[in-house]
Amino acid sequence: MSDTILNPYFGEFGGMYVPEILVPVLQQLEKAFVEARNDPDFQQEFQDLLKNYAGRPTALTLCRNLTKGTKTKLYLKREDLLHGGAHKTNQVLGQILLAKRMGKTRIIAETGAGQHGVATALACAMLDMPCRVYMGSKDVERQSPNVFRMRLMGTEVVPVEKGSCSLKDACCEAMRDWSANYENTHYLLGTAAGPHPFPTIVREFQKMIGEETKRQILEKEGCLPDAVIAAVGGGSNAIGMFTDFIDETNVRLIGVEPAGKGIETGEHGAPLKHGKTGIYFGMKSPIMQTEDGQIEESYSISAGLDFPSVGPQHAYLNSIGRAEYPSITDDEALAAFKELAKHEGIIPALESSHALAQALKMIKSNPEKEQLLVVNLSGRGDKDIFTVDKILRAKGEL
């Protein structure tokens, strides 16, 4: 491992497993990040953009109807209200400011559900940076509203036709582009995964989610929640929620992986509980692998959770037992999607619906239990309405 300023590992997970040509690029990024973190002017500009462009702080909303007949209080951290429609905007603004600080003149990114792509596109438009987004052709098809949004904001969207035509293939293409153009290009990675220092940078630019939640819940309830719950694909919204609660040992941290069509079918995206540790996407972390070590196809109804690995800090939190990682099926997520829309007037992203489904499962399993739960509603479901409409019609539920 080359010299780094910050620890590149979380326990045994993480690291910087990249072609030698990219090591100095990552070291430059780490140095710029450490300097920016200690620069009041950078922090002031970042905070100003979060407040006056993105719309922070986001609300913490008490569910009025979902918990009727139970003794649970359920709050939603409303990242769906952020400009761009999801938590992704937070760290995108931070990374583009970093890229400008390093003198980069071009941004590339990968996207699955399109939320990271939209966040990157809107921030690049506002901060005047050319932008290219790689997206699996399967995701281009199922997330057409977000593709249109990106193109409308001047971003070049490149459909990736290789492999499973999904997020992991978009990540590989973005990495290839970066390897060829690193001198003028910043790869704006969209989740808390990948080679060091990305997991740390993304966490630091997302941790205001948990910081705000802690302040807001103390103000509203006078105590900390019993559990905070977030969906986990790569893991950025969850680590953003968890970070400020890690040392609060009475607060359960629950990250929800996608069980897809059922763990037993093999069609899922739950590497933490059903994968094996290996090297993938520049890091050491749990991966869905075949017996001979090939990367297995992940699957989820939610494009943003359709990823065969997971961020290294989540792997570490799982290994030491600090966080729990249950999984939720497509059907359970769809049911939660419908319930929130019907009873609270909020349409969640399918990603967030997994976290909500876990909360509902906890509530329904013990309605008499007094508990205070917070779900990170990481994004809104506008992008998913066509997918859900098609599924519900096929099931005869509409």
Swiss-Prot record:
E.C. code: 4.2.1.20
Pfam families (alphabetical): PALP
Primary enzyme class: lyase
GO molecular function: tryptophan synthase activity
Requisite cofactors: pyridoxal 5'-phosphate
Recorded GO CC terms: cytoplasm
Keywords assigned by UniProt, alphabetized: Amino-acid biosynthesis, Aromatic amino acid biosynthesis, Lyase, Pyridoxal phosphate, Tryptophan biosynthesis
PROSITE patterns associated with the record: TRP_SYNTHASE_BETA
Biochemical pathway: Amino-acid biosynthesis; L-tryptophan biosynthesis; L-tryptophan from chorismate: step 5/5
Catalytic activity of the protein: (1S,2R)-1-C-(indol-3-yl)glycerol 3-phosphate + L-serine = D-glyceraldehyde 3-phosphate + L-tryptophan + H2O
Highest taxon above the source species: Bacteria
Entries under InterPro entries matching the protein: Trp_synth_b_CS, Trp_synth_beta, Trp_synth_beta/beta-like, TrpB-like_PALP, TrpB-like_PALP_sf
Modified residues (N6-(pyridoxal phosphate)lysine): K88
Subunit relationships: Tetramer of two alpha and two beta chains.
Role according to the record: The beta subunit is responsible for the synthesis of L-tryptophan from indole and L-serine.
Family (UniProt): Belongs to the TrpB family.
Name used for this protein in its record: Tryptophan synthase beta chain
Organism of origin: Actinobacillus succinogenes (strain ATCC 55618 / DSM 22257 / CCUG 43843 / 130Z)
